[in-house]
Amino acid sequence: MRTHLSSLLLCVQLAGCATAGSVEAAQRKPLPRQTEPATIAVDLREAGRHLLHVKLVLPAQEGTMALVYPKWIPGEHAPTGPITDLASLQIRAGDTLLPWRRDNVDVYRFLVDVPRGVSSLNLTFDFISPPSGQPGFSSGASMTQGLAVLSWNQVLLVPEGAAPESFSLRPSLQLPANWKDATALEQESRAADLVSFKPVSLEKLIDSPVLAAEHLQVTQLGENHGAKVSIAVAAETEAELQISPAELKGMQNLVAEEAALFGARHFDHYQFLLTVSDGVAHFGLEHHQSSDDRLAGRALIDPELSLAGMGLLGHESVHSWNGKYRRPAGLATPDYQAPMKGDLLWVYEGLTEYLGEV
């Protein structure tokens, strides 16, 4: 992760000022057994209006059920889940619209009374992406007329207590016409602009953002101990996609140096997801098999901007080892609602910054 330190400190201070009180009780019982993956379908066709449409099918069982929106996001180290951008939530059992209520204390928690005999819930809602210029990670500006970065934590509600490593979902994505996409997720099928991915755990889904754009180009950078490494670049124009020979050589050297430094790899493949646009928030956010990297629109064609921005790629890819493969205990929480403890954040970020620059 790279951003302004003051923003991170502010988030930590706000987290410490949370109102005390007890969470409204939903009857605690074992989660409904998953006989098949939950499904999540995201429609990106109105990304130019900063609007996503979401459909979820979740397992359910009779009684009061709690659904939660991811709050503490890995790599952001703070309770920054963009709950304020969720809108128009409707929950149905079949064709029956069910009333729901917000928890009186925890605004990331929703309660719904599930009728007898109901085994699944159908949810629909919208995600309103912030306008250009809005800072933040998954709460920052992520869409323009020509491109979008989807962080799955933006568009998820899951049963409370769902284990990230075992709760399974089948994701799909409806793209605008003629757009391309890049992600660490494995594609199962594609029909025109509808992309279906193989089922994955909740943990892997949130750890696998999608870069989509009309102008998108993928370039192979080499291998790290047998695993292919590539970079996907999305931009507002074709001209801004172009990687110079010097930049390409630097990226290839980065892959080779990391292979030599760490001596092994823990991913099946790795892809830099690089957005070059003045319409999105600028930062880097690490993931296990990819990184969400965002730079100014001319970052690849302006030599000064290019030199300043290339260090971001080294920082975020090092995080795949230091921060993802191995994570400080206080940041390895059991789910996305449990608070993180940042007492070892200096190792997570400090060592990564050093190695990334080297």
Language-model regions, residue ranges each:
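Positively charged n-region of N-terminal signal peptides that target proteins for export
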Residues: 1-4
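Bacterial signal peptide processing site
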Residues: 18-20
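Juxtacatalytic substrate-recognition/specificity segment
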Residues: 220-344
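Bacterial N-terminal signal peptides
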Residues: 6-16
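Residue-level detector of short, conserved catalytic/binding motifs and their immediate flanks
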Residues: 54, 87, 121, 169, ...
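Early extracytoplasmic/domain-onset interaction patches
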Residues: 26-72, 153
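Non-catalytic architectural context of zinc metalloproteases
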Residues: 45, 57, 74, 79-267, ...
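An active-site-proximal "capping" alpha-helix that borders the catalytic cofactor pocket
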Residues: 258, 347-357
